[in-house]
Amino acid sequence: MQLTEQQQDKLSKVQLEESWKRSLTPFLLSPYMDSLRDFLFQQKQAQKTIYPPSKQIFNALNITPLDHVKVVILGQDPYHGPNQANGLSFSVQRGVALPPSLRNIFHELHTDLGVPISRHGDLTKWAEQGVLLLNSVLTVEAGQPTSHQKQGWEEFTDAVIDVLNEQREHIVFILWGAYAQRKGQRINREKHLVLTAAHPSPLAANRGGFFGCKVFSKTNQYLKQHGIEPIDWQLDA
């Protein structure tokens, strides 16, 4: 793809890991991205507080390069409380109380694989091993859940899934809840494994369908079957 000087300049301003930037170039130069940039700029001009901090918006992609992805855990949008969101779905910064969904995830992990329940909720260790912790929407206004939906992020993360579909195989996609499952309809199930369950939020999980889903053991079993190093799900203290 031959780029003009203007296009190269636009790409240079995107703080994105190189393998993802190359693969997502058509989207990064699309009207969707222009519109999204304008929206975020207007939010900042209006002095709105946006989470996660700008340097962490693309954390999921920057920590887990395209050719390192083994697993995708799809979330909806970032936590909207102070010091929570760190750019990884379901993850929070160290020192922050565990959100209820993450507490349920840790309980399921403990029941499934006997992994001790972590006192902190920073999932960076998973991301570094190839777990792409991808929210559908990558930003949110402080205290306003879902406030940045339908501004272009959904199309961006659809493009991420499409790149994985086309360029990779034997990835495990973990889709918790109806929202993630709808978004995951575009995944090629002949090339990848798709695991579904209810959402880990207390409201959904307590109705049944999340606890006992055993996605962590099923993920590692599939990876081993395809000669791929399994994930060490235990977080450091």
Curated annotation (Swiss-Prot):
One example of a Gene Ontology biological process annotation: base-excision repair, AP site formation via deaminated base removal
Catalysed transformations (reactions): Hydrolyzes single-stranded DNA or mismatched double-stranded DNA and polynucleotides, releasing free uracil
Subcellular location: Cytoplasm
Active-site feature positions: D77 (proton acceptor)
Listed InterPro entries: UDG_fam1, Ura-DNA_Glyclase_AS, Uracil-DNA_glycosylase-like, Uracil-DNA_glycosylase-like_sf
Enzyme class per UniProt: hydrolase
SUPFAM superfamilies given in the database record: Uracil-DNA glycosylase-like
Top-level lineage group: Bacteria
One Gene Ontology MF term: uracil DNA N-glycosylase activity
CDD domains linked: UDG-F1-like
Keywords assigned by UniProt, alphabetized: Cytoplasm, DNA damage, DNA repair, Hydrolase
SMART domains referenced in this protein's UniProt entry, alphabetically: UDG, UreE_C
Gene Ontology cellular-component terms listed: cytoplasm
Signal peptide (from-to): none
Gene3D superfamilies the record matches: Uracil-DNA glycosylase-like domain
This enzyme's EC code(s): 3.2.2.27
Function of the protein: Excises uracil residues from the DNA which can arise as a result of misincorporation of dUMP residues by DNA polymerase or due to deamination of cytosine.
Family as reported in the entry's similarity comment: Belongs to the uracil-DNA glycosylase (UDG) superfamily. UNG family.
Name of the protein: Uracil-DNA glycosylase
Organism, scientific name: Acinetobacter baumannii (strain AYE)
